A protein has these predicted regions:
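Extended, helix-rich architectural segments
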Residues: 1-76
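Glycine-rich, Trp-frequent "lid" loop and neighboring beta-strands that shape
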Residues: 65-113, 117
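Extended, charged amphipathic alpha-helical segments
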Residues: 134-192
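A short, compositionally biased
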Residues: 36, 42-52, 93-96, 105-109, ...
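A general structural signal for short secondary-structure junctions and capping/turn motifs
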Residues: 38-43, 87-92, 188-191
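Generic structural signal of hydrophobic/aromatic residues within well-ordered alpha-helices
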Residues: 16-23, 30-33, 38, 99, ...
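Extended, non-transmembrane interaction/recognition domains
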Residues: 107, 113-149
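Short, flexible loop/turn elements at secondary-structure junctions
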Residues: 53-55, 100-105, 184
Length: 192
């Protein structure tokens, strides 16, 4: 059964409808993307969801609609998150003030994206696949962060003791498999 959501005054909005039908700009619906987020969080313990919007020269919302410029979702698993930092606000709440992740990687280079409250920077790092890579990094793009916050949400399966590391369901499955194996071994010994 698909979830039901109340979008309030945005119900029927063209950009919202487009987003719900193609949430990741790769043809997958919002429900499908969120199902993948849930599955990855279950496997890894957590995963990151980043909401971004392409840079545009559109001056009005009508121009954005005509060019199909709208927010989209990207999913990053823990092995893609290289570094992060949380700070405590004056109210006592923790907030993310830096996130560094591997956006793309191949044999020759990696694309690293660094989110801060002030900027979003994209670097190309050569020879990234080597352990303790000493490859040169080159700034490809640095744009101001228009919202002043990092547009990322850490989705937990179960919260762990350390921020932002979650607890995977696979650990429970491993214990269950071990128990089943031990039970079968005991039964086999009783039969002999």
């Amino acid at each position: 059964v698909p979830p039901t959501r109340d979008y309030g005054s945005l119900d029927g909005d063209e950009q919202l409808t487009s987003f719900l039908m193609d949430a990741d700009l790769d043809g997958r619906s919002f429900n499908t993307v969120m199902r993948e987020v849930q599955m990855n969080a279950s496997i890894y313990g957590n995963c990151w969801v980043i909401v971004d919007k392409p840079q545009s020269n559109a001056n009005t919302r009508a121009e954005e609609l005509a060019q199909d410029i709208r927010p989209y979702i990207s999913i990053y698993t823990p092995e893609n998150v290289v570094n992060w930092n949380y700070r405590r606000s004056p109210s006592g709440r923790f907030y993310l003030d830096m996130l560094m992740l591997v956006e793309d990687i191949n044999a020759d280079r990696a694309i690293i994206k660094v989110f801060t409250e002030e900027t979003i920077s994209t670097y190309e790092v050569e020879e990234y696949s080597e352990e303790y890579s000493k490859g040169d990094s080159r700034l490809i793009e640095e744009i101001p962060n228009p919202i002043g916050k990092i547009p990322a949400v850490n989705v937990y399966n179960l919260r762990g003791a350390k921020r932002p590391i979650g607890i995977s369901d696979l650990a429970d499955v491993a214990y269950l498999q071990q128990s089943i194996y031990n039970d079968y071994s005991e039964k086999e010994q009783l039969i002999r």
